[in-house]
A protein has these predicted regions:
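Cytosolic, long alpha-helical scaffolding segments
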Residues: 1-141
Length: 141
């Protein structure tokens, strides 16, 4: 976040633009914090991130991260607005894919799991990962 704030100080943008960009940076800053909480929860309960059920959501998060990295570069270098809007649409498509994936995971979980503790822990992780997916699409939690 510091790099973006420094760049803002060197760039001519209106105070409104500067405030929006700083809000955007703070919004993005929370994503790694959310991911850290997921990792902590998984470690606390001895859950393996390599489980195939978690990988579906993790793959979506990685795709979103790559898109967001490109979008931030577009903002910094004031590049093609059309490409930026295309990336926003792709983020929203990934968010919808995340919603669909969550529904599939929950359906499978409730159909297959007989262990209540495992069911609750996995559901909790699914929900936390879904919040990360939503965050990239700029959905408030």
């Amino acid at each position: 976040m510091g790099e973006v704030t420094d760049e803002l100080g060197r760039s001519f943008v209106t105070p409104f633009d500067r405030e929006n960009i700083q809000n955007f940076c703070q919004y993005l800053y929370r994503i790694p914090k959310m991911i850290e909480r997921v990792v902590q929860r998984m470690e606390l309960h001895g859950l393996n991130a390599g489980r195939t059920d978690f990988l579906h959501q993790i793959d979506i998060i990685l795709e979103e991260a790559a898109l967001m990295e490109g979008m931030v570069a577009h903002l910094i270098h004031k590049r093609n607005a059309k490409q930026m809007m295309h990336n926003v649409a792709l983020l929203h498509n990934l968010e919808q894919k995340g919603d669909d994936t969550l529904q599939d995971l929950l359906s499978s979980l409730f159909a297959e799991s007989r262990d209540v503790k495992d069911l609750m822990l996995r559901k909790d992780i699914y929900d936390m990962l879904e919040k990360v997916i939503d965050r990239y699409a700029m959905r408030r939690q």
